[in-house]
Amino acid sequence: MKVKRYINITKPGIIMGNLISVAGGFLLASRGEVDGLLMLMTVLGLSLVVASGCVLNNCIDTDIDAKMQRTRNRATVTGDVSIARALQFGLALAVLGFGLLIRYTNSIAVGFAVLGYAVYVGVYSLYMKRKSVYGTLVGSLSGAVPPVVGYCAASGQFDAGAAILLLMFSLWQMPHSYAIAIFRFDDYAKANIPVLPVAKGIAKTKLHIVLYIAVFAIVSALLPLSGYTGLTFMAVACVTSLWWLFMALRGYRKNIELVVWARQVFGFSILTITALSIGMAFDFQALPPSLLVMLS
């Protein structure tokens, strides 16, 4: 079905992951007083923006995708959806998504949505992904935007809680993406994409994965330590982050099956961020920590 082709180029898995994180950020900032309509429009609007970014990314990456085993059957590569049609579809999604955010949220939330979109489409997809080993680092910023948009839509401000979310989700993106780059090493090498394993080697990538997870674990603890979440979130953050770190350290064992290990690190990264997104949605503190407001 032609409709399915268009749905697939929006990358539904990415949309679902971002939907969970934006809802988590919104509920954390709402502190039990949830505006249902605002939440619905925020989640829907940002989901459309993310879908638009994914479609435009498919259009930009057609030449790269054609070289990779994982992506060579995408509709924009095979011609099942023309680039012109995909561009029209992607831009229409952007208009709808940003329209909803502008209509129902606030300038801070919209500003972060614009920032994430511009970084992902304009900076990461068009240039950094192809040219720099730091492409993953730049792309991590756009991946960290959804929970911040949700948080700012509900709170109307960018405070310490939003800053922690931005840092936490940016840090999470790095080992998550590096794990993918390891078990998809051949694809990235064939397409000449300078991800860290291809450009600097597996050993350096393993070290970066461990270091980023360690810092992520510390930053995740800042939400409960700063009074934004409670002990339940702290327990979930500690258990998931430390187990993820343990899994990463297993990569240094002798005779480790590299691809299997990388897939395990990747898989648990999704479990970790999903658990934390759900945790912060329900284990919020009813009274905001007023001393931590940075910008209001």
From Swiss-Prot:
Membrane-related topology note: Multi-pass membrane protein
Protein's cellular compartments: Cell inner membrane
GO CC, alphabetical: plasma membrane
Keywords: Cell inner membrane, Cell membrane, Heme biosynthesis, Membrane, Transferase, Transmembrane, Transmembrane helix
GO molecular function: protoheme IX farnesyltransferase activity
PROSITE patterns: UBIA (PS00943)
Transmembrane segments: 9-29, 36-56, 82-102, 108-128, 133-153, 163-183, 207-227, 229-249, 264-284
EC number: 2.5.1.141
Domain of life: Bacteria
An individual GO BP term: heme O biosynthetic process
Biological role: Converts heme B (protoheme IX) to heme O by substitution of the vinyl group on carbon 2 of heme B porphyrin ring with a hydroxyethyl farnesyl side group.
Family matches, as HAMAP family: CyoE_CtaB (MF_00154)
Name assigned to this protein: Protoheme IX farnesyltransferase 1
Lineage: Bacteria, Pseudomonadati, Pseudomonadota, Gammaproteobacteria, Alteromonadales
Gene designation per UniProt: cyoE1
